[in-house]
Amino acid sequence: MSAIQPPKPVERKIELEPHQILLKPLVTEKGVHRATRNNQYAFQIHRDATKLDVKKAVEHLFDVKVLKVRTQTRKGKARRFKYKIGRTSDWKKAIVSLHEDHRIDFF
């Protein structure tokens, strides 16, 4: 049996800056609960961003230590405009867990 090889890094045509990776914080009732109890923060992120990109961006922009990043790709919803049916855009969400000594104070 051969050993399992780690995945090859994905080559992107564009390199994203930290302010391009984190699009906006997701401030919801559930998000505020996570921030106060579990020290986890949610952000809407660029669709091409990886977990490592998100970790580096949060650490660079907020001067905190990130323990874990979880990502989700959310599907857009069907919406109706007059007599036509369309869809909202798909988007990507990241939930970032911080070290217990660090906080992001805008939540």
UniProtKB/Swiss-Prot annotation:
SUPFAM superfamilies with a match to the protein in the record = Ribosomal proteins S24e, L23 and L15e
Alphabetically list the UniProt keywords: Ribonucleoprotein, Ribosomal protein, RNA-binding, rRNA-binding
Write down a Pfam family by its short name.
Ribosomal_L23
The reply on keyword Zinc is no
Name the InterPro entries on file: Nucleotide-bd_a/b_plait_sf, Ribosomal_uL23-like, Ribosomal_uL23/eL15/eS24_sf
Q: Which GO terms describe its cellular component?
A: cytosolic large ribosomal subunit
GO MF annotation terms? rRNA binding; structural constituent of ribosome
Record-level GO BP terms: translation
Q: Which domain of life is it from?
A: Bacteria
Quaternary context: Part of the 50S ribosomal subunit. Contacts protein L29, and trigger factor when it is bound to the ribosome.
NCBIfam families, alphabetized: PRK05738.1-3, PRK05738.2-4
Give a short account of what the protein does: One of the early assembly proteins it binds 23S rRNA. One of the proteins that surrounds the polypeptide exit tunnel on the outside of the ribosome. Forms the main docking site for trigger factor binding to the ribosome.
User: What's this protein's family per the entry?
Assistant: Belongs to the universal ribosomal protein uL23 family.
Protein name according to UniProt: Large ribosomal subunit protein uL23
Source organism per UniProt: Rhodopirellula baltica (strain DSM 10527 / NCIMB 13988 / SH1)
